[in-house]
Amino acid sequence: ENSFDNVLCCFVWRNVSDTEKALSEVYRVLKPGGKFILLDMTRPKNSFLKIIHKIGTYILLHFVGFITLNLKEYSFLYKSLDFYPQPEVHLSKNNYTNLVIERVGLFDFVYLGVFTK
């Protein structure tokens, strides 16, 4: 409890089954003023870009999965992009004093969330 200055989580959040419990656990182990930095992928907010992104990632991820003989894993990655609601909605329900979410990358499908305890 209150043990860590910062917690960093990159590209695994879509695989966490109970994100509310995970947010609470990270909050518990962070020192006061500590930061939880979360980097992951989602679908774009813009409806048109979301359609383009879905088509593009379907083709690209299934192609890469086929070439690398990891079709199951890349199919999961494609499906996982739709599993959670938009991070601006999903991550705003927590005990942290400050939350900043910034979208980066082409189509804004990568997001960076910084939570402060």
Give the location of each predicted region:
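A short acidic, Gly/Pro-enriched loop at the edge of an enzyme's catalytic core
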Residues: 1-7
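A short glycine-rich, Lys/Arg-flanked "PGG" loop and its adjoining helix->strand segment in the class I
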Residues: 20-35
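C-terminal alpha-helical "lid/dimerization" subdomain adjacent to the S-adenosyl-L-methionine
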Residues: 39-93, 102-103, 111
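C-terminal beta-strand of the catalytic ATP-binding
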Residues: 115-117
